[in-house]
Each structure stands twice: as C-alpha cells, then as structure tokens.
C-alpha cells in the first residue's frame, strides 16, 4: 500500500486530499470515476471492495434518485459532489445488528478501511510538509463536520446510530494519531541515517580489519608450518648426527677394549666337570710387572746371601788376636786358592755399603712397581666394567638406537641391574641428555608378581616425581612400553657414583668427605621437611652420584625404590613406623634395629638414614666399612654382624680429627634412642665449619667437649 501511495502523481494526491477535507479543486476538470477508483484502491484492505455511493443499491428505498449533479464534462465542480461523509453515511445507514452475514462483513470491512487509510497517509514520510501538516491536524474534525453538513437521506430513527458511528470513527482516528511532528521525524531520520552510516562505516572498518587479521593468520599459519617443517628437519638431522656419534663412540670403545684385552687381560671360559665358568686371565702388562717383581725378589735374595757371606769374612775387631784355628783356615784357603779370605775392615765396610745401596734401590723399584700395579688394577676394574657393559649392550634389544615414546633417542648402555637397564638418551623435545631406566619383567613370572613389581615401581615414581631439590636426581617422565616393560626418565649426570670412586681411590681426604656428607645431610633434611616426610632407607655409595666424577664437586642422591613414606596413618612420632620390607636393602649400611626379629615388625624412623650417613663417612675416611667389611650379605645375616656392632673402632691410620670421630660416633650409636635424628644431624657443629671453629676457640664448653671426645678417642684407639 505504501508503494501505491508513493507512486501517485501530485495531482492525484491533491484530489485525494480534497476529498478528505471537503474543499473543491479549481485547477481543472476532475474525473470522479478515476478518483473514486484511486480511493478505493488505496483504502481497500480486504479482497472485497468497499461499496461506494455510486455502486450501492438501496433495497429499502424504491424511489428514483436524481441525476448526478456533478458533471465532469462541464469542467465545474458543485457542492453536491461525493464527499468523504457519504462513505460514513453509508456506514451509519447500515445497522450493526439484524443484517445478514454479508452485510455485517461489508460493514466491518468499511469500518476498518478508513483508519488504515488514515494511518497510511499520516505515516507517509515523503509528503510535502507545508501541505500535509495543517491539513493533517484537522482531519478528525473534518470527518465530523462533513457528516453533519451532509443531507440526511434517512429518517430520524437512524440519527442516533449515525452519531455513534461518527464517535467510533473519531475515536479510532485519534488512536492512530502520533505526537511526533514532521520535523521530529525528519530529525530522527537524520540521526538514524547518521548512526546507520557510522555503523556501516564501523562495519566496513571491522570487515577490513578482519580481512587483515585473516590474512595475517594465514601468513602466520604458513610460517608456522614452515617452522614446523624446519624443526622436523632439524630433529631428524640431530637424530642422525647423534646416532653417528654414538656409533663412532661404540666403535672406539670396542677397539680400546680389544687393545686392553691384550694389555690388561680378559675372561676365558673354563670347564669344570659338567659346568663352565669364566676365569680371568691377566694381560701382558700385569705379566711384565709380575716378572719385574720376581726379578727384584731374586736380586734381593742374592744380595742377602752375599751379605751373609760377607759377614763370615768380617775382620775381627781391633785389639783382638785371631785364634789359631782361623790362621790355619786362612792358610788352607790360601793354599787352595780360594777367594773367601778375611777382608780388612775397610774392605768389609765398603762391601757392606754397596749391598745396602743395592737393597735400597731394589726397594724403591719395588715400590714403583707396586704403585704401577695398583694403577693397573684400577684400570683393569674399568676394563672389566667396560667388558661387561659391552657384553650386556650387545645382548640388549635396545642396542639399535630406538626412539622411545616418540621422544627419547637411546644412545648407549650405562649399566644393567637385576631387572632393569639404564641407557644414556637424548630428549628430542627438551633438547637435553637424560638417563632412561627400562624396567623389564620376567615373562615367566606370575601375573601377581608382575603386578606387585609394577606397583612397586609406580610407588617409586610417585615418590620421586614430587621431589625437587638440587641434591636429588630429578625424575622427568614415566611411560609404559608394553605389558612387560616400562620406563622412567631421570636426570643425567656425567660422573660416576661414590662406590666406583672408592673402588678406584680407596679413600679420600677428610675435607672432601665432609663436603659430601654435608650435601647428603642437606638432601635428607629436605626429605624430612616435606609433607609427608620420606625415609630413603637405601643410602649407600652406589646411590650417591658424583656430578663431575671427583670428590670435590656436587653430589646427587638417587634410587628411591625402598623409600618409606611417613604418613599419619603409619608413622608415630614416638615409636616410628613398622618396617614392612625387612630383609631388603644393603646390610652394611642398615642400623641394628632393622635386623631385630620378633613377633611384630621392628619400628624405624629417619634415624635409619643417620646410621647410613655414619657408615658412608667412615668408609670415605678409612677406605673400608666399619662393620662386616670383608663379609657378604649372607654372612652378615647369619653371623648377626650388625646386631653385634655395639661400638665403632677407628684404625690409627689415616689420621682423622677428633671432631670427625665424635661425629661418626653420634651417627653410629647402637640404640636408636641414643642416636641423633636428621634435624639434629643438620644442626651438628661438625657440619658447620664457622660454628665449629668459634665453639672450639671461644667456648669453654666446646673445649670441654673436644677434650672429652679426644680422650675417648685415645682410649678407644689404644
């Protein structure tokens, strides 16, 4: 409908307004038929056209109507032309009730047509402001006056009904009116248009920004793909170079091992009855040293024999006359031409001095050979260890540099235990060297035993994963390979463990040993400060790693497989916790309470680790274990060696300070009630050099303690 109104020409709009206002148009002849048709086309909302005064048929009136007074051919307009009131008059003449269905329907359609038409005309935004504003203000009143001025063609009975119709039309028309003026509407339109332009501009900007961002995302995505491809190439090249380097190192190790087999020795298989055993055969280096020792021994024996003969030819002392028998013997020897005649005193001393010098030289040479022999023994230990490592590596299923978990490239075998292998590996993700411990279960085990071992390893992983201390080896990762094997990824340390160092060097200085003990105690203090606290239970030189392979560097503690968690359910601050794994561990480093057999399991606490610290410190200082040094674990268990270790004995050499001996005694107290715990161990004066010096120099109590400890040390050493 709005499109039809907009399509009218100005002349027809003026004619339409004249019909609403009742004012004639003097600008030319008016075609009433066309104007009525246009009005009906605009005002009709239903499919049935509204009846006009020309078309309506009055069934009630049978009289003839006058001819149309308005003649379009004459070109003049008369006041008897059809007005808008005629449409309302038709509506007023039809009663609201008592009509048939078609009449009621036509009345309802005519009633709804006019307000709709008026609302459409008022809402038309493009009408001229000067023409529409004054006319639109009086539309309502024009309808009422037009109805009053029109001649009534009905009786007085229809007057009230027509008035009610006029009121209804007037009310409906007022309800469709608005308080907004054309100026306000135009202002709102302008503001809306400006807002719309701003929004459209903002939308355009956002679209351009979105396009730019999409373009940048595409560029970054392409760059990311490019970098990923480059990274993959770098990783592939790194793997290739690492494998080549590992192969070269393996070849070099095997060449060196083959050379050392001739120089240091090798294992040979010897048959004993129905069984075969491996027997060690020394190489030519040891054989040469043994020959030199045999030569030195034979020369020493010869010198001793000559010294005895020289003693027989020793001249008598001054003032003593030789006996007659000696003279007769000398004569006989001279007559016989023998050379063992009596020497003069000067000749005797000269010959004696020569023999002494020769013996001294042989002794020095023997010491050098002994030192060389000890050095070769240390090298032989390395050689034997390398032979075993190469043998285990050649028989391993992981010898061909596999990549485990798509991340860890195995390089070479570090060592092998009962059910595990430790490989040096490279982490391709973090770009660092790691130690991968591969746990392999025996396929012949029962499922229950496999589950128990796996549960034990998971427990170790959970304990170790939460630890974060510079003196404890870090655990990075844990994953399964198959149903019978899984891996743990640990921090890699270049050096060896303390046990290997002691086998190579026997012992170390007190300063170096104290430095190692201080670091161990620092780690134990951390284990007892976390919640819940942890007992390591398996402290020994084999579980203490030397980072750079020397005794004057950093250490790290590893292997938490036997650790005990002191949670609230199992640990009592007075009695400790029950030892559920009695018989496990390394017996040389366990305290006596771990070997007590009774109806109930023994109670342990962190004092177990304190005892282990004392044993390790003693072994570092003296090169031997304080209890059961040359015994096996089975002998220690059968002979109750640790249960009998009520007091520690110190050898006279090497020389150790009284403070170190007192510290060892505090750690190796037989009764656990008399032994210090980890917290007291961390505050021990011996491990704090500045406090120890100040106490020994300024405090009389410290001097008294030092004197008593020195006296006790003297008494024990005596």
From Swiss-Prot:
Cell cycle-regulated, with maximal activity in the S-phase. Rapidly and transiently inhibited by phosphorylation following the generation of DNA double-stranded breaks during S-phase, probably by CHEK1, possibly at Ser-696. This inhibition is cell cycle checkpoint- and ATM-dependent. GO terms for molecular function: ATP binding; protein serine kinase activity; protein serine/threonine kinase activity; transmembrane transporter binding. Residues 46-61 have a biased composition (Basic and acidic residues). SMART domains: S_TKc. It is an enzyme of class 2 (transferase). Keywords: ATP-binding, Cell cycle, Chromatin regulator, Coiled coil, Cytoplasm, Cytoskeleton, Developmental protein, Differentiation, DNA damage, Kinase, Nucleotide-binding, Nucleus, Phosphoprotein, Serine/threonine-protein kinase, Spermatogenesis, Transferase. Its EC number is 2.7.11.1. It is found in: Nucleus; Nucleus, Nucleoplasm; Cytoplasm, Perinuclear region; Cytoplasm, Cytoskeleton. GO terms for biological process: cell differentiation; chromatin organization; chromosome segregation; DNA damage response; intracellular signal transduction; negative regulation of proteasomal ubiquitin-dependent protein catabolic process; peptidyl-serine phosphorylation; protein phosphorylation. Residues 408-687 form the Protein kinase domain. SUPFAM superfamilies: Protein kinase-like (PK-like). Residues 193-244 are annotated as: Required for interaction with TLK1 and DYNLL1/LC8. ATP binds at residues 414-422, 437. One of its GO terms (cellular component) is perinuclear region of cytoplasm. The active site is at 538 (proton acceptor). Residues 193-244, 285-315, 349-397 form a coiled coil. Residues 24-85, 147-176, 310-337 are annotated as: Disordered. PROSITE patterns: PROTEIN_KINASE_ATP, PROTEIN_KINASE_DOM, PROTEIN_KINASE_ST. Residues 29-44 have a biased composition (Polar residues). Phosphorylated at Ser-696, probably by CHEK1. Autophosphorylated; phosphorylation promotes the assembly of higher order oligomers and enzymatic activity. Serine/threonine-protein kinase involved in the process of chromatin assembly and probably also DNA replication, transcription, repair, and chromosome segregation. Phosphorylates the chromatin assembly factors ASF1A and ASF1B. Phosphorylation of ASF1A prevents its proteasome-mediated degradation, thereby enhancing chromatin assembly. Negative regulator of amino acid starvation-induced autophagy. Belongs to the protein kinase superfamily. Ser/Thr protein kinase family. Monomer. May form homodimers; homodimerization may enhance autophosphoylation and enzymatic activity. Heterodimer with TLK1. Interacts with YWHAZ; association with 14-3-3 proteins such as YWHAZ regulates subcellular location. May also interact with FEZ1/LZTS1 and FEZ2. Interacts with CHD7 and CHD8. Interacts with DYNLL1/LC8. This is Serine/threonine-protein kinase tousled-like 2. The lineage of its organism: Eukaryota, Metazoa, Chordata, Craniata, Vertebrata. The gene is Tlk2.
